[in-house]
C-alpha cells in the first residue's frame, strides 16, 4: 500500500494558521505561539477561537477550527461548537460543508451531541408551517438517521428520545388516514426505543403504557405484553451498564466560555486518566459479551460506537487507540485509525510501531521510514524545548526538569533503536546503517543504548564482531564515564570471550566511572568473570582492589556474588536465605540495575488494584461526614435561610445536574493559574 492511501488532512491550508502574520499582535499572537509550541493543546485552540469571536474575526475562527480538525478529526465537541457558532450567525452554506466533513467518509463522527446539532439544522431548514407534510417527512428521516447512527447505542440518550417523541406527538393530523399513520409511527418508535438500555427508560415505559390505554384499552394489553419482556431486559442491562461504568467521566464544554482542563482531555498518565481508561475498557469488554443478543453486524456497530466514544474522551491514550485499531480487521482501515491516532499523539512509540507494522505488511518501506521520521522529529523538538527551558532557568524545579530531559532522551533513543532494527528487517543492513548515521549526528542527545543496539545488530547480521567493536569504541568517546555503558560493553566482550579486550576496557574505565553503584557492578562483573574463566589469584587481586575502594562492603556479599549462576545468587537463595532478596535478584538478572527506570508503565492488574484502592470514580474511600464536621459560617448562614423542601410540591432545582455542571464546566481558579494568567 503506498503512502498516498493514507488519509489526507482535512484542510490543506491549515498549516498557514500556525505561522503568525505581521498584522497579528497582542493576545492573538500569544495564543498562536502557544499553539505553535504545543499543537496538541486543545484548550489553547479554544481560547484562541474565543478571542477571535470577540473580535468578530470569523474568517480566522474558521481557519483555526480547520487547523484543529486536522489534528483532532474525531474530537466531536469541537465540531459541535463550530456548528453552533455558524448556526447562530445563520451561515447555512458553511454549516452544510462542515456537516459533510464530520458526518461522512472515513472521519465520520458518531457523537450524539454532534448529530443532534445536525438535527437542529434540519429542523431549522424545514419549517413545518410552510413546508407541511414534505418538511415533516424530511425531519422524520433525520430523526431516524440519528437514531441509527448513535442513539440506539448510547446509554445516555434520553434527550434525543424525548425530542423525537415530542415531535411525533405534536403532529396534528388533518384526517383519519394521517391519524392512523401517526399512531403507527408512534408505536414503531416506542417499539425501537423501549428495547434500548438508556437513562429515563422507566419513565418512557410508563408514558408508553398510558398512551396505549388512551389509544385503545382493548388492544393495549396485547401491545404492552409484546414489548414487556424486551423492556425488562433493557432496564436490567442499563442498570448493569451503570455498575460497569461507575465513575465514567464524559464531560465536554457546552460553549467556548466553559472550556477548561476539567472538561477537555488532558495528556499524561495520571491516576485519573488510568482509572478512566480502565472504565472504558470495562465498558468495551461488557459490550463484547453481547448481552443484547444483537446480530453480528449490529454488535460490530455498537462496539465501534463505544470505541469512537472512547478515543474522543481518551484522545491522548495510546492504549485506547491501539485497542480500537486491533478491533478493526482490515489492514487499510487499521492504518487510517492509527494514522489519525498519531495526529493527536505524534510522539507515541507504540502507535508509531504499530502503524509501521501495517505499512510493512504492504511492503511500503517509504511509509515505514516516514512514520518513524515523524515520531523522532517530534521527540527531538520536545527535547530541545525542554533543554531550552532548563538552560534558561525558567523552571525552578531543576531536578524534575533534568529527569524529564533524560526521559526524553531515553524515549528518542528507544524509537531510533526500533527504527534501525525495523529497517534492517525490511531493507537490509544498508538501510539500518543509514538510520544509525542519523543517530550519530545527534551525538550526546541520544543515550548509549543506540550504540549497544547497533553493535548487536552488526554482530547478528553476519557474526561481524569487528564492526561491532568499532561501534562500541565510537560510543566510548561519548560515554567513557557512564558505568551503565561500560557494563554493557563488558557484557558484549564477555559474550564473545575477548579476554584481553575485557581487561583493557576494565583498566581504562575503572578510574573514570563516577557512579559508585555502577562501579561496584563493574568490579563484581570482573570478579565473577575471573572466577569462571580466569584464575583465583586474579580474583583475589580484584577483590583486594574492590575492598580498598569500598571498605564498607560485606565480605560474604561479594563472595556470594561471584558464584552466581545465570545472574542468580544461589548461595543466598539456597543457603543464606536471610540475605536473599528475590525482587533484587530478578531485577538484576533481567539486565536492569542501570539506575534509570524506563518510562512509566502500569499493567492492567496494577490498574485494577489502583481502582480498588481509590474506587471506580477515582476518589478515595467515601467516608460520611461526621456530624461535628466544621462548615464555613457562610454556608451555615445560607442553609439557615433557605426554605425547607417540604414547602415545595416539585423540585425547582435538580441538585445532581447542578453538581455535574459545577464539576464539568466550572474551573475554580488556583493561586498558580491566577499568577500565570
Swiss-Prot record:
GO terms for molecular function: mRNA binding. The keyword Nucleus applies. HAT repeats lie at residues 56-88, 90-124, 138-170, 181-214, 257-289, 298-330. Its main location: nucleus. Keywords: Cytoplasm, mRNA processing, Nucleus, Repeat. InterPro entries: HAT, Rna14-like, Suf, TPR-like_helical_dom_sf. GO terms for biological process: mRNA 3'-end processing; mRNA processing; response to DNA damage checkpoint signaling; RNA 3'-end processing. GO terms for cellular component: cytosol; mitochondrion; mRNA cleavage factor complex; mRNA cleavage stimulating factor complex; nucleus. It comes from the Eukaryota. It is found in: Nucleus; Cytoplasm. It holds the Pfam family Suf. SUPFAM superfamilies: TPR-like (SSF48452). The keyword Cytoplasm applies. Component of the cleavage factor IA (CFIA) complex, which is involved in the endonucleolytic cleavage during polyadenylation-dependent pre-mRNA 3'-end formation and cooperates with the cleavage factor NAB4/CFIB and the cleavage and polyadenylation factor (CPF) complex. Present with 5350 molecules/cell in log phase SD medium. Component of the CFIA complex, which is composed of RNA14, RNA15, PCF11 and CLP1. Interacts with FIP1, PFS2, YSH1 and probably also with RNA15. Probably interacts with the phosphorylated CTD domain of RPB1/RNA polymerase II. This is mRNA 3'-end-processing protein RNA14. It comes from Saccharomyces cerevisiae (strain ATCC 204508 / S288c) (Baker's yeast). The lineage of its organism: Eukaryota, Fungi, Dikarya, Ascomycota, Saccharomycotina.
